[in-house]
Amino acid sequence: DAFSSLRAHLETAYWEEAVALLTEEDLAHLRALVAAASEKLSQPRIQIPFQEHRELHLTIFRRLDNPFVVGILGAYWDAYEAVELNTFADLGYLQAVWRYHERIVAAICAGEYAEGKRLLIEHMQLLSARGAPMELPAGANGAVPALRV
């Protein structure tokens, strides 16, 4: 999907700049979002942590001084909800997504931005594997393979 590809390219292209701008308050908020999502997924009546998912990604990029990037990412999450990608897939998928989020946030908090970016790209592949194809940026060589599952 072209919109998902745009999101993947934006998030990876602006990753280093965005995470370098995060404040201690932002880092605490990211950790709280991971904890809230984990709580929702461990309840007897599981709740889908869509708002936490959206907020986690938008928090990482919200300090960018670029209203176009922030606006496009916000529109992506609106579309994500509109086409019901926020609906229940299966518990294993949701748990895998949030394990990635936890590791991404831990890497950011530790200042390991390259590791966080690597995990972000792996995390995006989960969506592709779920049946929502997207093109993901490859490594530093700039090649962008189309991932279709």
Residue ranges and their predicted role:
Residues 125-134:
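Short arginine-rich
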Residues 3-86, 96-106, 115-126:
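Conserved amphipathic alpha-helical segments that form helical-bundle/coiled-coil interaction surfaces
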Residues 1-12, 16, 20, 133-149:
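Short linear motifs at protein or domain termini
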Residues 89-93:
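Solvent-exposed loop and edge beta-strand segments that line ligand/cofactor-binding
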Residues 112:
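Phosphate-/nucleic-acid-contacting segments
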